[in-house]
Amino acid sequence: MTKILIVTDAWEPQVNGVVTTLLTVIKHLQEKGHSVEVISPDMFTTVPLPVYPEIKLAVFPKRKMARLIDAFAPEKIHIATEGPLGWAARAICLKKGWRFSTSYHTKFPEFANETARIPLRLGYFVVKHFHRKSSAMMVATKSLDDDLRERGFTNTVTWTRGVDTELFNCQSKPALKLEKPVMVYVGRVSVEKNIEAFLNLDLPGSKLVVGGGPQLKKLQRNYPNVTFTGPKFGDELAAHYRSGDIFVFPSQTDTFGLVMLEAMACGLPVAAYPVTGPLDVLAECTAGKMDWDLAKAVKQALKADQKAARDHALKFSWPACSDTFLSNLTPL
């Protein structure tokens, strides 16, 4: 048994791929007998992130975090995010001479550039500074690994993702009956997800958006012909995937795109841009169509084989993802 500490600024009740990944990996690690402790924002005084009020940022967490770390006495520490908790944990580890691993879940420089016009060069300077002392900077895909190494990162290792193919399946009864073909988006409804590139497509059929976020009310007003459901979970989420004919993934800033695997597990071909995330998730998949013209990718996906989508999703497993995570950790 290993005592593993995970420090993360992204945690419940947030709904995103980072939280889903961490929760699932922790579950698998605990089932194998490892002791896993999480230090998360709910343990501290927090303030809302101005652009995303649902994201809570810890205020001056370092002193309390040091006490929490000492109380748990971990054998391995993983810092999952570059927020206040991540920086505090990093500082504590460096002061004590401890080794630690990190992960890169979001293209922070692109996110900051999109939401706050922070120059990409400055964003990557901050990210490189944060991760450079890490013994292993875990990234989700080979294309992201290659991109970061071209930017001068030297400590990256690949940590791919999985999907629950029992929950997300081709047998679920569709939650909605909409005019076909039905094009589905699932995920955060926020500016960096580039959802309007999907909503502006002039194509026959219906568009379904499942998820919540800061742009939801605005998009509901601007696109009255689109069906917005808000967030869905578990069996209900699977049923909403099954309401669609294809899945559209318009983001150009994700490092992976877990929702693509969930959609394919439900038998939905995927249309996306040829960027980091889709380039890896959809590689060698005949049911994944990528094009800089998103409408063209959608039209191709509508002709793709649903069984091929499901078969591709079956190649990704959470146990394998958890094993990779564990092997990437380093003793203090």
Regions found by a protein language model. Give the residues of each.
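Donor nucleotide-sugar binding/catalytic pocket of nucleotide-sugar-dependent glycosyltransferases
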Residues: 125-171
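Short alpha-helical donor nucleotide-sugar binding micro-motif in glycosyltransferases
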Residues: 131, 231-232, 239-244, 325
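Conserved donor-binding/catalytic core segment of Leloir-type glycosyltransferases
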Residues: 175-208
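Nucleotide-activated donor-binding/catalytic signature segment of Leloir-type glycosyltransferases, i.e.
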Residues: 217-235
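Aromatic "clamp/platform" in nucleotide-sugar-dependent glycosyltransferases that forms part
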Residues: 252
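Short hydrophobic beta-strand element within catalytic cores of glycosyltransferases
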Residues: 269-272
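A charged, aromatic-enriched C-terminal amphipathic alpha-helix characteristic of glycosyltransferases
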Residues: 303-331
